[in-house]
Amino acid sequence: MKENLFLFFDDKNKLSRNGFERKLGKPKVVEIYKDPNAYTAIGFPAIWYDEDKGKYHMFYNGYVDGKCAPLAAISDDGIHFTPRNTASESGLKNPFAPNQIMEGCGELANVYVDLKAPKSERLKALVTYGDSKTTRIINDPLYTSADGIRWLRQPVQWHNHAAEPGAMAFYNPVLDKHTIIARPDAGVRRIGLIETSDFKTFSDIRLVMTPDSLDEPLAEHYGMPTFPYENYFIGFLWIFHVPNVRERKYYKGTVDAQLVYSYNGTNFNRTLREPFFTNYDAPETKGMVYPSSMYVNREGRLLVAASASENEHGYFKDKGVIAIYELRKDGFISLHTEDSGDVITIPMLYRGGDIKVNLKAEHCSCALYTDDSDKKPLNLLTHELIPLEDFTHENCEEFSGDTLCWSLRWKKGDLESLNGKIIYIELKVKKGEVYSIKGNLTPMMICDLARYHLHGIVPDITGIG
């Protein structure tokens, strides 16, 4: 049975919590990559790990002598990159830089790794091409490649209007479709969504995110790279903080990123209206930071590649680096307590295996409860929590320290004896933070219990099925 991960973006799966506050994780810059020939303030890097050769490849835009070109770099560990000599390998005639991958294609919006495609077309380059005379984007071609060196233009347009660099794609297993996140049209700073099953036909773009009344005054949404993460989809919403002047919103103003998330890859929710990737992580990021690729390297490190610049918006061609951030596994948002806190989940259908907690705490214990819903499935409003005698806080093998995976254990109780039962999980934490709970668990809302006990129906946590 597939395990489910429970992050703390919201309280949907909690019955009660006391003494906790939500706290954003802290991605840390672990490396700064500077292209020797290009400025990459709006490089929007994409990372591909070539399992056959054991190498990480980074594709990005760079300005070389004021001209934009799609470029590539290579790495052994996904952190330390060097330019890849792609221009000579692919036989480019007049490259701007030795690590250029294509000529005359326009700007690189994103390179997507399509694991469902034949190997010859596994890399999909979403490109935007503009008319230099009118400065208007006139088409959005698609290129494919097997190796990231030789690219073939396909006879399709991936956007039915006009996108811009900063678009990206991900696979949605809930719908079994590829999803492209892009602007609804050129210059329209809102977030749209396109779906395709085969990269031959594409849906019309539909709006999924736009500034609201809780955003700071005048803020605009610049892009929203999104990534499947266990049973979630996690996005980095680029926020353009524009100056309060009566002029066109282009020159000056900083860019940072806030967290968004989805259970189904279609409907997205905001989290804390605070920067997750801030402008003060490194001197090179004080003007703009655009996280555009999230990946786990072979060592299990959760990494994010981002374009960054000390310049503010509109000044793209004379500065820019690519920052590599590291983030704690599941370390997006925690439940944090400076003193003591307790949290108990809603009822969960437990189907065997370990229950694991990612946390850092001076002290933590766990107790399990059940209820009488199996005996009174239609008595929806008065289910009583019943302590499980061998799974109390007193019997828990308590934890102190910092771990990505604390497997719950009790001195007497055998967790497997509860397989198939409804349980509630209660954590008591002293001075610490909890990042996630993971296990063969399905959350059961009030009517789900009746449907399960009467008809054996297990709810679909995505909200689509």
Residue ranges and their predicted role:
Residues 1-465:
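Carbohydrate-active catalytic/glycan-binding domains of CAZyme proteins
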